UniProtKB/Swiss-Prot annotation:
It comes from Oncidium hybrid cultivar. Catalyzes the single epsilon-cyclization reaction which converts lycopene to delta-carotene and neurosporene to alpha-zeacarotene. Required for lutein biosynthesis. It is an enzyme of class 5 (isomerase). One of its GO terms (molecular function) is oxidoreductase activity, acting on paired donors, with incorporation or reduction of molecular oxygen. GO terms for biological process: carotenoid biosynthetic process. Gene3D superfamilies: FAD/NAD(P)-binding domain. Pathway: Carotenoid biosynthesis; alpha-zeacarotene biosynthesis; Carotenoid biosynthesis; delta-carotene biosynthesis. This is Lycopene epsilon cyclase, chloroplastic. PANTHER family: LYCOPENE EPSILON CYCLASE, CHLOROPLASTIC (PTHR39757:SF3), PTHR39757. It catalyses: a carotenoid psi-end group = a carotenoid epsilon-end group.
Length: 518
């Protein structure tokens, strides 16, 4: 559901057929014809993308056929956010070797850099100096638990969902909209206070030196040495990291949104609409190859509203122009008139896919480390909450190595990074992720009626159970209880689908194997 988002072989009832094979790698070399953004207006634009990616999956993670819009989202102007380069000391090639270089300047990278600096490490932050542009939605209690409640700009005490009737499901959990500039300012302040350095540059590669240290190669062949490098540069990090071979194919959650001044808004501004799966365009025939979408609504006031049409997950990204068309059709059918558009949003979240190779020396964090919840698309709370512990582990590794009588840098015969990887992805975490991947594969197979039945059942679970599922706080054993409870209260049609899915989908056997691994 949102960067906040949610995510049977064949079942007997209304399960959609599998789509064909993905577009082949030459897709990268094509030109894409793009519809214009609503605010800018103008003619259709032709864009040629020339960026280099590690492979086809890396290209898909970066945005695939929707890459133009992903780049537009990244580069939206955010005047309230200060440039990182204006606040942090610039890193240069003549500086002493850094303990840690964090590659990537999103919330995950900045939080990890600040936490590592807080623990006494010399830290460098490297990446394009871009603002936070995504509209993050979070459960208020989770952000309060991180001490970041001051970064929430709007809170709805009531959260609701509509599935197939006008009677909402009351979720009874406060939901907040994160202020992008306040969160950016807070993380930047933490980096500044802990002495983190910064370089506004893309990273081309990471080289392991003969003494076991790492050399981060930036644009212009600028080489910066460090004792450890951690990649937090987003999903498309295949040039810098190795990922497990033979894992599940990555799926994608896409959403197109507008924040607008509107007339005849039908939603109560006191409530946040987590999902609205109702069919507002009556009688419309949905293509067999089209995934269902829902409306996500943040009413800032009775007339200023953020509407977002969201495809929970799909094997091939639902195009943004299709989502925009669906959103406008939905709003028109609801009688909503758009008077002024303040902002457009193009949200692209890869979900699922392979874990990083946990035997490699280079570390990862955030989305690059596959920390996105496979079944929901959430990641920011997990990244911010795990940054302190991860920074502590990295600090202990480096201090332990410094105290070694054999070497003052990381020796080539021993890979201490394995300890950090095991902290980030212990066997317990792999079991949980396998369960979520099983849920993602289930969602991918359901049509609109199946999804409605699934969520009707889901929100009948005890609050602590469904909240734990969304927040990744249920243990692997707790997830088994979740499955049993879900099965017990589900209608027979959903039970049959769950059984068939477990027995026939590869994610079922993978989940069982992970649960049996000690």
């Amino acid at each position: 559901m949102r960067s906040a988002a949610f995510s049977l072989p064949f079942c007997d009832w209304k399960c959609r057929r599998r789509l064909g094979a993905a577009d082949k790698w030459p897709l990268l070399k094509r030109s894409f014809r793009i519809l214009p953004p609503l605010i800018a207006g103008g003619a259709t634009t032709e864009v040629k993308e020339v960026e280099k990616f590690a492979d086809e999956e890396d290209f898909i993670k970066a945005g695939g056929s929707e890459l133009f819009f992903v780049k537009m989202q990244e580069r939206k102007p955010m005047e309230k956010q200060r440039k990182i380069a204006d606040e942090l000391t610039k890193i240069s090639s003549g500086d002493p070797m850094l303990d840690l270089i964090v590659i990537g300047c999103g919330p995950a990278g900045m939080s990890l850099a600040a936490e590592a600096g807080k623990r006494g490490l010399s830290v460098g932050l490297i990446g394009p100096d871009l603002p936070f542009t995504n509209n993050y939605g979070v459960w208020e209690d989770e952000f309060k638990g991180l001490g970041l409640e001051s970064c929430i700009e709007h809170v709805w005490q009531d959260t609701i969902a509509y599935l197939d009737s006008s009677d909402p499901i009351l979720i009874s959990r406060a939901y907040g909209r994160v202020s992008r500039h306040l969160l950016h300012a807070e993380l930047l302040r933490r980096c500044q206070e802990t002495g983190v350095g910064f370089l506004d540059s893309k990273v081309e590669k990471i080289i392991e030196a003969s003494d076991g240290s790492s050399i981060v190669v930036c644009e212009g062949d600028l080489m910066l040495p460090c004792r450890l490098a951690t990649v937090a540069s987003g999903a498309a990090s295949g040039k810098l990291l190795q990922y497990e071979v033979g894992g599940p194919r990555v799926s994608v959650q896409t959403a197109y949104g507008v924040e607008a001044e509107v007339g005849n808004n039908p939603y109560d501004p006191r409530s946040m609409v987590f999902m609205d799966y109702r069919d507002h365009v009556k009688g419309k025939i949905i293509s067999d190859e089209e995934y269902p979408t829902f409306l996500y609504v943040m009413p800032i006031s009775s007339t200023r509203v953020f509407y977002e049409e969201t495809c929970l997950a799909s094997r091939n990204a639902m195009p943004f122009d299709r989502l925009r068309s669906k959103l406008m059709s939905r709003l028109k059918a609801m009688g909503v008139s758009i008077l002024k558009i303040y902002e457009e949003e193009w949200s692209y979240i890869p979900v699922g896919g392979s874990l990083p190779n946990t035997e490699q020396k280079n570390l990862a964090f955030g989305v690059a480390a596959s920390m996105v919840h496979p079944a929901t698309g959430y990641s920011i709370v997990r990244s911010l909450s795990e940054a302190p512990q991860y920074a502590s582990v990295i600090t202990n590794i480096l201090k332990r190595n410094s105290n070694s009588s054999q070497n003052n840098v990381i020796g080539s015969s021993y890979n201490p990074s394995v300890l950090a990887w095991r902290t980030l992805w212990p066997q317990e975490g792999k079991r949980q992720r396998a369960f979520f991947l099983f849920g993602l594969a289930l969602i991918l197979q359901l049509d609109i009626d199946g999804i409605r039945i699934f969520f009707q059942t889901f929100f009948r679970l005890p609050d602590w159970m469904w909240q734990g599922f969304l927040g990744s706080t249920l243990s692997s054993a707790g997830l088994i209880w979740f499955a049993f409870y879900m099965f017990a209260i589900a209608p027979n049609s959903l039970r049959i689908c769950l059984i068939k899915h477990l027995l026939s989908d590869p994610t079922g056997s993978t989940m069982i194997r992970e649960y049996l691994t000690l």
